[in-house]
Amino acid sequence: LKNKKISITTKKKLLKEKEILLAGYNLFVTRGVEKTAIDDIVKLAGVAKGTFYLYFKDKYDLLDQLILQKSNEIIKDGLKKANSLGIDDFRKRTLFFLDYIISYLKENKSLLKLINKNISWGLYRKAMMKPKEYDEIKNVLDIFVRNLTNYGIQKDEAEMTLFMIIELVGSVCFTTIILKEPTDIESIKPILFKKILSMIGV
């Protein structure tokens, strides 16, 4: 009976956290982060303000968790697709994976705006420190770095290469999909992929 009560309490906590995350996401993509107050988030989530602080330090902590959660979901779906097609070659797998993410962001422009303005390498470092919560992110980062080190590249250089690819893809996606400059994403994608292949150099 005691375990059942604990289970119910845990479920309620997870539900409240989920409601706060959902409310935060909806407000961030419609109003923007700066124009969204914690009062707005808790009102939409239907929870007390004190409840918010049980899960998040502030709205930026909520934003970080949202970005990591969404990134984890996209990466998980991308991995499923790659696995279902049986793509094992590192270069082909990398390009397929990036193409999947680009296509997803193209269809979800609000998410692209949110991610592009607030993503950082430090955020992915945070994901590496919480492998249970963001297992897919950690898995992909580990595999990428390990593949490069297998080709004789130093681990530090492999991590910096990954950082540059994340920055490059994010910047190109935002500029071409949102600003539509200097061309559309489909036109620039072959050049982008060519540059990425030269960066990983394997």
Where are these regions (language model features)?
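Hydrophobic alpha-helical connector segments
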Residues: 65, 80-107, 165
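Alpha-helical DNA-contacting segments of helix-turn-helix folds
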Residues: 56, 63-73, 77-78, 115, ...
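Amphipathic alpha-helical packing segments from all-alpha helical-bundle domains
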Residues: 72, 76, 124-152, 159-163, ...
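Hydrophobic/aromatic residues within well-ordered alpha-helical segments
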Residues: 16, 59, 70-74, 97, ...
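Short secondary-structure transition hinges
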Residues: 103-142, 178
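Hydrophobic alpha-helical segments that form the core
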Residues: 155-178, 187-199
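N-terminal intrinsically disordered/low-complexity leader segments
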Residues: 1-15
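Helix-turn-helix
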Residues: 19, 27-61, 65
